[in-house]
Amino acid sequence: MQKIEAVIQPSKLDAVKDALVEIGVEGMTILEARGHGRQKGHTEFYRGREYSVDLLPKVKLELVVKDEMVEQAVQAIITAARTGTIGDGKIFVSKIDEAIRIRNDERGEIAL
């Protein structure tokens, strides 16, 4: 099992969710987040005053999938989230040692 964490633009959330459901991903956690990468935010004007917006709104998706589904899930996220501009986001993949369903103590892939 592997955990996929993707930080994407909020406007791409529905497309990414739909793409993941289409390939058979049954569960995911979605969090609102703020952050910046290389784009470092931007400058805006309000009532004639300039101010800096350093932390931009993002969405973080977390999902755990079977090893054989990792590449398909990653490609689904990339295809659905890509705009081709700075700030499209990042994907992180890491190994999961164990998954446990709290309700009935099921363990391993069956708990997904």
Spell out what each predicted region is:
Residues 1-112:
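Positively charged, small/polar-rich N-terminal and surface patches that mediate targeting and assembly
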